[in-house]
Amino acid sequence: MDIYRLPALSDNYIFLLHDPNQNIGAVVDPAEVRPVIDKLESLGAELVTIFNTHHHFDHVGANKQLIQKFPQLKVYGGVEDRGRIPGQQVFLQEGDRVHFADRVGEVLFVPGHTIGHIAYYFPSVAFGETGELFCGDTLFAGGCGRLFEGTPAQMVDSLNKLRNLPDNTRIWCAHEYTLKNLQFAITVDKDNTDLQSRWAEVKTARGRNEATVPSMIGVEKRTNPFLRWEQPALQLAVQSQDPVQTFARLRGRKDRF
C-alpha cells in the first residue's frame, strides 16, 4: 500500500492510498476534489473508497463530487456521524475492520474534537515496517485538535488510546500545524531537550516549505505536551496533578495562544 500526501485548502492534507497491484485508490478525508483527481489520473487508478474521520467540511468537502465521478464508491465514517457525512454508506464503530490492498485496518473511536470522530489504524504487516494511523483532527504533530463537541475527559481517553500504539506508527494527521504547535509546546515544556531539537528541525523544514507530516508515535510521546499530561514539568506549568485537568488547562492555554 502506497500513501500519497496531497496538500489542500490552506493547510489541509488529503491522503490517497494506492494499491499498485490492482491499481485502485482510497482517499482519507477529501477536502477538495482536484488534488485527488489529479493524483488518480497520474497513477491511472480508479477510486473505490472514501475513509472519513469526521464530519467537518474540510474533511468531507469533496465527497459529493467524487461520488458523482466514481458512482461505485464506498463511503466510510463513524456511526455517530450518521447524517453528517455526505454519501456515507458504512457506519463504523470501535473495533470494526476495514480492508484496502493487502492491509486490514482497525477502527478506533476517538471522540473529543467531535463526538463522532474515528481514526483508522493499519498495523505493520512485517518486522521493521511502520504501522499507519489516519487520525484526522484528534492528534496532530506536536498538538491535538480543539474540543468542538467533546469533553476533556473524552479527549484524554482518545489520546491515550493513540499514545498506546507502537512507537513506529506513522501519524498521518490532517493539517500542517506543527510549527505553531511546537511554538506553544516550548512555552510549557521548555527544558525538554527532545522538544528543543524537534523545534529546531521543524523550523528549518518549514523554512524550506517541507511537510512535517507524517510524524511518529514515539516522537510525539517525547515532545507533544498533549500526550505528556503525567509529566511533572507540564503539571507544574498548569498547577495540576490531575490528568484530565492538566490536559484541559493545557488545551485552554493553546486555544488562547
UniProtKB/Swiss-Prot annotation:
Q: Would I find Metal-binding among this entry's keywords? A: yes
Keyword vocabulary terms for this entry = Hydrolase, Metal-binding, Zinc
Superkingdom in the source lineage: Bacteria
Q: Which GO terms describe its molecular function?
A: hydroxyacylglutathione hydrolase activity; metal ion binding
Which pathway, per its entry? Answer: Secondary metabolite metabolism; methylglyoxal degradation; (R)-lactate from methylglyoxal: step 2/2
Q: Where does Zn(2+) 1 bind?
A: H54, H56, H113, D137
Q: Catalytic activity, per the record?
A: an S-(2-hydroxyacyl)glutathione + H2O = a 2-hydroxy carboxylate + glutathione + H(+)
**SUPFAM superfamilies from the UniProt entry:** Metallo-hydrolase/oxidoreductase (SSF56281)
What cofactors does this protein use?
Zn(2+)
Q: Name one Pfam family in it.
A: Lactamase_B
Q: Which SMART domains match?
A: Lactamase_B
> One GO biological process from the UniProt record?
methylglyoxal catabolic process to D-lactate via S-lactoyl-glutathione
Task: Spell out the coiled coil positions from the record.
Answer: none
Per the entry, what this protein does is:
Thiolesterase that catalyzes the hydrolysis of S-D-lactoyl-glutathione to form glutathione and D-lactic acid.
Q: How does it assemble?
A: Monomer.
Descriptive protein name: Hydroxyacylglutathione hydrolase
Organism (species): Trichodesmium erythraeum (strain IMS101)
